[in-house]
A protein has these predicted regions:
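Low-complexity, intrinsically disordered terminal/linker segments enriched in charged
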Residues: 30-47, 59-62, 67-73, 90-186, ...
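Bacterial Sec-dependent signal peptides at the C-terminal "C-region" and cleavage site
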Residues: 22-31
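Low-complexity, acidic interaction segments enriched in glycine
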Residues: 165-167, 175-184, 189-209, 217-305
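Bacterial N-terminal signal peptides
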Residues: 14-23
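Extracytoplasmic
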Residues: 50-53, 73, 278
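N-terminal secretory signal peptides that target proteins for export/translocation
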Residues: 1-10
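Short, basic/low-complexity N-terminal boundary segments at the transition from targeting/disordered tails
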Residues: 37-48, 53-54, 137-144, 239-259
Length: 305
């Protein structure tokens, strides 16, 4: 009888314990503003500082998924063409790392809508090019944000000096509002899976990064093949390949006689490598991970068989 009397109390304690554990798990699944900011600073393809992200709102959509809206400070490089039209050329994704905006829009499949190169009205004082209005319009057109809008806030427009540049260039620092979808990866914490701006659709960042790397890989292979052809021309005239263990030395010898364009860095903005002996050579790129001697290295060797 005593054992039977204890059983309901025992079961009750188990049920209470389980409910408490579920409650604790639910608390741990909550996404704080700090966690959201950390995830956004390290979203795929980006390395941002904490000060570059201002989280405006966070909401859970399930125990392991959430959405967050934030303002992100981005740095863009604008270029002016021969017809005096401005375009967004690059976006800075990490310290000393830039991505080609045309390449990103091609991978994402985005198109720009607004015409932003109409002449600005006359103004007094120092003229800033592009004007804040034009910069905001170009960014809004790129990101699917109808200008004017608080979703695009220009912080600074400043000249961007590039030695021997053929086109005028300007740096634009802007705060862009983004919507993000996040997933709880357990021990890895919260991670951004998708991003949306303005009226654009949701974009999977890992898919975009993979698409960018695929295009860059094709570009790297084409560039290495071009250098390899120059080395074959060199051997045809000199009787051997260029003997060197530095890519910069090889390019200095090949350009411009055998190579019309000096190709020094790969699409990930890392120096190509060269190892050359009289009878053979190896050209390589460290690939997407920017590390030598790893599985994603891109290698072209000669002579071709």
């Amino acid at each position: 009888m005593h054992a039977r009397a204890e059983r309901p109390a025992y079961l009750f304690r188990i049920i209470v314990f389980c409910l408490l554990m579920l409650s604790v798990a639910g608390v741990h699944a909550e996404l704080s503003t700090k966690q959201a900011r950390k995830a956004i600073t390290r979203m795929a393809g980006f390395e941002l500082t904490n000060g570059a992200v201002k989280v405006k709102a966070v909401s859970l959509t399930s125990p392991t998924t959430a959405e967050a809206t934030a303002l992100v400070r981005n740095v863009f490089r604008f270029e002016k063409d021969a017809q005096a039209r401005w375009r967004i050329a690059e976006i800075r994704t990490a310290p000393n790392r830039w991505e080609d905006v045309d390449l990103i829009t091609r991978v994402v499949g985005a198109t720009t809508g607004q015409e932003c190169n109409a002449p600005d009205p006359p103004i007094r004082g120092t003229i800033i090019e592009p004007s804040v209005k034009r910069a905001r319009c170009l960014l809004g057109s790129l990101l699917g944000i109808q200008s004017p809008s608080d979703a695009v806030r220009i912080q600074e427009v400043a000249p961007f000096a590039i030695p021997l540049a053929s086109q005028p260039s300007t740096t634009v620092i802007a705060w862009i509002q983004i919507d993000t979808r996040l997933t709880n990866q357990g021990k890895s914490g919260w991670q951004v899976s998708e991003v949306r701006t303005g009226n654009r659709g949701w974009v999977n960042l890992e898919s975009v990064l993979a698409g960018l790397n695929q295009v860059k890989r094709q570009t790297a292979l084409a560039e290495l093949a071009t250098i390899a052809q120059a080395l074959e021309k060199f051997r045809s005239e000199r009787g051997s390949y260029l003997v060197a263990d530095k890519h910069s030395v090889a390019i200095d010898h090949l350009s411009p006689r055998y190579l019309s364009r000096a190709i020094r860095v790969d699409p990930w903005q890392q120096p190509y490598t060269y190892q050359g002996l009289r009878d053979r050579f190896t050209l390589s790129s460290s690939g997407p991970d920017r590390k030598d001697a790893t599985a994603d290295d891109i290698i072209v060797s000669g002579p071709a068989h």
